[in-house]
Amino acid sequence: MKMLASLLALGLMAAPAFAATESFNDVSVVDVACSKKAVADADSHTRECALGCQKSGFGIVTADKKFLKFDEAGNAKVLAALKATDKTDHIRVNVSGDVQGDTIKVTSIKLL
């Protein structure tokens, strides 16, 4: 019985390591502070606002209007992209990563 419990516990701990990578293409980037109001019209969210609210972090609005926050690495990647772009609004990306709850652990991101 102890062996079965140990194997079950080990399996549960290893499950996140086998999480499937998901890709989201042509989705809007929004800062966390503005995410609730921006979900309705994410394309109207501006680069200026995103940079002004950068301390709250960033995420994407999916096609089904769900907001997924980025992990720290994703925040750093999108912040660098936002600082480098001339776009003022309609900030969209292709992003891949492991979704865990309402957070995406970003493995790749490309500003469109």
Q: Which residue ranges define each predicted feature?
A:
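Positively charged n-region of N-terminal signal peptides that target proteins for export
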Residues: 1-8
